[in-house]
């Protein structure tokens, strides 16, 4: 996907999700994850959540347990994946200590938070577009 296509996808996501509830649906989360994995040069993510897996596959994202990008819901798993150099992505603020990227809801809108320290320890590089759209924390 070129930069123009990625920018169009971002506009579509933001326009689509502005009316969502505080807790993000699997479909909304999958749209953000698709942008994230595409920006990294990959098109796959590890994900054990059945509802999110179906939404990811509907977005054309391959769910593969060997991926360097991992969606985590449990801190113990996130800690292990982080130690392996994988990019941990999570949907709750309590995972901020382990996650390189958080996709959360704030005031009914999706919010992308990038933990730059955790991102540096991952063996994944995110594209400039994603880095610009996320709020960075050290």
List where the protein language model places each region.
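Short hydrophobic alpha-helices and adjacent helix-cap/hinge residues
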Residues: 2-9, 15-138
């Amino acid at each position: 996907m070129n930069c123009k296509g990625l920018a169009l996808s971002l506009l579509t996501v933001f326009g689509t999700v502005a009316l969502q509830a505080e807790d993000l649906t699997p479909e909304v989360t999958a749209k953000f994850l698709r942008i994230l994995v595409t920006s990294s040069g990959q098109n796959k993510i590890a994900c054990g959540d059945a509802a999110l897996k179906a939404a990811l596959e509907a977005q054309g994202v391959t769910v593969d347990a060997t991926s360097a990008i991992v969606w985590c819901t449990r801190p113990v798993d996130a800690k292990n994946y982080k130690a392996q150099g994988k990019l941990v992505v999570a949907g709750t603020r309590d995972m901020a200590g382990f996650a390189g990227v958080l996709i959360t809801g704030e005031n009914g809108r999706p919010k992308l938070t990038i933990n730059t320290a955790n991102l540096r320890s991952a063996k994944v590089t995110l594209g400039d577009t994603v880095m610009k759209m996320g709020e960075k924390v050290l």
